[in-house]
Amino acid sequence: MRANRVGEQMKKELGDIISRKLKDPRIGFLTVTDVRVSGDLQIAKVYISVLGGEKKKEEALKGLEKAKGFIRSEIGSRIRLRKTPELEFEFDESIEYGNRIETLIHELHSDKPSE
């Protein structure tokens, strides 16, 4: 339960830190979609969505990896925890998956003969 609360707070703070504090042009338009913190609060998986193609995604991930130490120290100063979780950034594939499913459903309905 506590890990969920910490994850929600981290999601809010990470969104603010990334949009306002980071000046790396590689990061671009990025959204933190979810943060899952391990039960022992040692690791936080940060799921991100990036606007653009694969190259933009890879560039954004490189920028985040380079700024990981700064981001972690900012989180540590904003959220009171004994130890700030280690950050792991991953792409959130659920949005693309959802869009693909929606497209397939739309195609099925448009191919269906009207009754």
From Swiss-Prot:
SUPFAM superfamilies: Ribosome-binding factor A, RbfA. GO terms for molecular function: ribosomal small subunit binding. GO terms for cellular component: cytosol. Gene3D superfamilies: 3.30.300.20. Coiled coil: none annotated. Its main location: cytoplasm. InterPro entries: KH_dom-like_a/b, RbfA, RbfA_dom_sf, Ribosome-bd_factorA_CS. It comes from the Bacteria. GO terms for biological process: maturation of SSU-rRNA. It is found in: Cytoplasm. Keywords: Cytoplasm, Ribosome biogenesis. Transmembrane segments: none annotated. Belongs to the RbfA family. One of several proteins that assist in the late maturation steps of the functional core of the 30S ribosomal subunit. Associates with free 30S ribosomal subunits (but not with 30S subunits that are part of 70S ribosomes or polysomes). Required for efficient processing of 16S rRNA. May interact with the 5'-terminal helix region of 16S rRNA. Monomer. Binds 30S ribosomal subunits, but not 50S ribosomal subunits or 70S ribosomes. This is Ribosome-binding factor A. It comes from Bacillus velezensis (strain DSM 23117 / BGSC 10A6 / LMG 26770 / FZB42) (Bacillus amyloliquefaciens subsp. plantarum). The lineage of its organism: Bacteria, Bacillati, Bacillota, Bacilli, Bacillales.
